[in-house]
Amino acid sequence: MIIGITGFIGSGKDTIADYLTTFHGYKRISFAGTLKDACAAVFGWDREMLEGTTKSSREWREQVDPWWSERLNIPELTPRWVLQQWGTEVCRNGFHNDIWVASVENQLRKAKDNIVITDCRFANEVNAIKNAGGITMRVERGDRPKWYDSAVAYNRGPNGNSNWALSKIKLDKAKVHASEYSSVGLKYDHYIDNNGTIDELHNQIEKLINL
């Protein structure tokens, strides 16, 4: 089985993946795995910290790297900013829209284990999992961001959507990166409510994988 998970930061994606790998033998891969490998090599950053699976690593990813910021004259240069820019603007937009999808597809065609992917951020990534025979889930926890409705409207596309252009303006004004809003409002196979206890979350996952 292949399971693709999407959700905002702190929604519980990593918690679900840890449960599946620990108790059900799933192997964890990610669309951004090779991107993080590259950034760790080029910028000399700790690879585990780039993963952002702990509170301390997520906080570190938001901190400006003083040496690189001064050297490249980019005041806002944080590890997370680099991942977004390199992953989307440089590689997706500048090289090929399917570069990260193809990288994961290459891993999937060789895989023999059950797979969990925790960083589905774009429609083509969600579709790739479905096309591979996998299932997708959206994890919800806490309040939705103020720009949520704008993201839903924008992701519907321009056809018959009078709010499309205005929605993009609102997202740009809110300084929301495409990797944060592009998964909002898409159709998923399952929706997970993670506003309860950890046991309640695990029970939802058990029911899902035993369908």
Q: What do the PLM-derived regions correspond to, one by one?
A:
Residues T22-I29:
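Post-Walker A helix-loop "phosphate-sensing" segment adjacent to the P-loop in P-loop NTPases
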Residues R28, I115, T136, Y191-I192:
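Short, well-ordered beta-strand core segments
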Residues T6-I9, S103, N127-N131, V139-L211:
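Small-molecule kinase domains that catalyze NTP-dependent phosphoryl transfer to phosphate-bearing small molecules
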Residues D119-F122:
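Short, well-ordered beta-to-alpha junction loops that form the rim of enzyme active sites
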Residues D14:
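Walker A/P-loop
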Residues G33-D113:
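ATP-dependent small-molecule kinase phosphotransfer cores
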Residues M1-I3:
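Extreme N-terminal starter segment of soluble prokaryotic enzymes
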Residues I5, I117:
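Hydrophobic anchor at the beta1->P-loop junction of P-loop NTPases
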